[in-house]
Amino acid sequence: MIKIVALIKRRADVTLDTFREYYEHSHAPLFQRSIPDDVAAVITHYVQNHAVRLGDGTTDAPYDCITEIGFDDIEWMRTWSRWYLGEEGKVLRDDEERFMDTSRRVVIVTDEHRIGTDV
């Protein structure tokens, strides 16, 4: 399985709680309704992995969320990328500027290999 894995940091003026609320309840629905059916059909999953505060919460994790978008193969990932980086995908990119520090985002294309559940 091919995945786009993005390490996301919130903007400095956005609290962690506000970031999570916006990402889950505003951006994710925008993601779902903005993507045309032919592009949505190539996505196998969309997952937000939010950082958990540990200890007293006085220190921030280096990233606030790790987002995964999965595809069955590299061509399907390219279909998504063409849409996202094109004019129609601008609606998502513009929305990301509202709550993400996009200058700190790290994006990696990965090939997932599940090792097993007994490890």
Model-based region annotation:
Residues 1-119:
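Macromolecular interaction modules
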